[in-house]
Curated annotation (Swiss-Prot):
Residues 4-168, 177-352 form the EngA-type G domain. It comes from Clostridium perfringens (strain 13 / Type A). The gene is der. This is GTPase Der. Keywords: GTP-binding, Nucleotide-binding, Repeat, Ribosome biogenesis. It comes from the Bacteria. NCBIfam families: GTPase_EngA, small_GTP. The lineage of its organism: Bacteria, Bacillati, Bacillota, Clostridia, Eubacteriales.
């Protein structure tokens, strides 16, 4: 089940980043060194009242003029409207209501998306009356907070989670495998989706997707029920490349967050780029099921070793996710396109797999017998037992004497044992080590 997305919108210097970091707490961390993935704090996981959600800070670079500020805020608001389940609109209680605030409020009102209006920098009771003028925005009662002091955050979060769907309401979509087609523009993502829809000749309905430019295509085939999401995004030109790049990353992240299977589509002639590595790195960090589809394979001159060598080169560049599945196709000619959905279903089945506790502990016991944990600081890791606590992705908890005694190479060894024993091919898995007394 994907987590709700909460997007923060507001002018520069109203305290969005302070609020973002306060809510994220210690949850933002570098889990591992994944090549090509920048930790620019675009997103963070958070939780309130046992509801987990993803926060996205839409703020980009700091503009220099008021005209640019308004343009940037329009973009922020548009992105939030496109992809968020709930929008948090942050305004400055000390500076007061501005024309830019009013313009963005108008966009948010028209969107019909849930909006929580937050008046920041109200750090003492005497400033409460500063919030009254924000009623003029017409988007509900303002909630006063001080992000820097942590005041009022509980009231704000209570309001945010009110708008989340009850998990049971999402059960209908749960029978569909949600696939995000990700990758740079012009690699053939849309052509590929059209080819899949055109070839299958089945029940297809189009419903508005998470982004204004994309349509979620519902598709039923002999391989299963699928939702195909094209992450094309906006194609507006901008003088500020960094800003557009950030917004592109935010959009793609949101699509991956809501997906079961992430399919990175690359152009066979261009090969894989740093941007591709960054994009698929997000899916890897979230432990999604992952496929790499090399499109336009018909344009490559080949001999009997071309495909094998090309795949080895890709696997070397993407060695941080050795479990990914690879396909070489042509959306234009239809070559191997029929294998995409069956491979996605295979990856999804592994992503959804549950392992019995008995079998799991047998495998772990044998793995430890074959290779003992190394000694760390004169002590050795002891694994008491393990259990699977979740699927989509598969998550395991290992109860041990001291998690600090786990050497990363031994952790990798145990993960490989799980993968080989239970066939977690094509999907990320998560292993957590918890301390337990003997």
């Amino acid at each position: 089940m994907s987590k709700p997305i909460v997007a923060m919108v507001g002018r520069p210097n109203v305290g969005k980043s302070t609020l973002f970091n306060k809510l994220a707490g210690k949850r933002i961390s570098i889990v591992q060194d994944t090549p090509g993935v920048t930790r620019d704090r675009v997103y963070a996981e958070s939780e309130w009242l046992n509801r987990k959600f993803t926060m996205i800070d839409t703020g980009g670079i700091e503009p220099e003029s008021s005209d640019i500020i308004v343009k940037q805020m329009r973009r922020q608001a548009q992105i939030a409207i496109e992809m968020a389940d709930v929008i948090v609109f942050v305004v400055d209680g000390k500076e007061g209501l501005t024309a830019a605030d009013q313009e963005v409020a108008q966009m948010l009102r028209k969107s019909k998306k849930p909006v929580v209006l937050v008046v920041n920098k109200i750090d003492r009771l005497a400033l409460e009356e500063n919030s009254y003028e924000f009623y003029n925005l017409g988007i509900g009662d303002p909630i006063t907070i001080s992000a820097s002091q942590g005041l009022g955050l509980g009231d704000m979060l209570d309001e945010v989670v009110k708008y989340f769907n009850d998990p049971s309401e999402d059960e209908e979509d749960d029978e569909y495998i949600r696939i995000a087609m990700i990758g740079k523009p012009n690699v053939g993502k849309s052509s590929l989706i059209n080819r899949l829809l055109g070839e299958e000749r089945v029940i297809v309905s189009n419903v508005p997707g998470t982004t204004r430019d994309s349509i979620d295509s519902y598709l039923e085939t002999e391989d299963g029920k699928f939702i195909l999401v094209d992450t094309a995004g906006l194609r507006r030109k901008s003088k500020v490349k960094e800003e557009i790049e950030r917004y592109s990353v935010i959009r793609t992240y949101a699509a991956i967050e809501k997906a079961d299977v992430a399919i990175l589509v690359i152009d066979a002639e261009q090969g894989i780029t740093e941007q591709d590595e960054k994009i698929i790195g997000y899916a890897h960090e979230m432990n999604k099921a992952i496929m790499v589809v090399v499109n336009k394979w018909d344009l490559i001159e080949k001999d009997d070793k071309t495909l094998s060598n090309y795949q080895k080169d890709l696997q070397q560049k993407l060695k941080f996710m050795p479990y990914a599945k690879y396909l070489f196709i042509s959306a234009l000619t239809g070559q191997r396109v029929h294998k995409i959905l069956s491979t996605a279903k295979y990856c999804y089945d592994n992503y959804s797999k549950r392992v019995s506790t008995g079998l799991l502990n047998d495998v772990i016991s044998k793995a430890v017998l074959m290779k003992e944990p190394p000694v760390v600081a004169l002590k050795r890791l002891k694994i008491y037992y393990a259990t699977q606590v979740a699927t989509k992705p598969p998550k395991f908890v290992f109860f041990v004497n001291d998690p600090n005694l786990l050497h990363f190479s031994y952790g990798r060894y145990l993960e490989n044992q799980l993968r080989e024993s239970f066939d977690f091919d094509g999907t990320g898995i998560e292993i957590e080590y918890r301390a337990r007394k003997e």
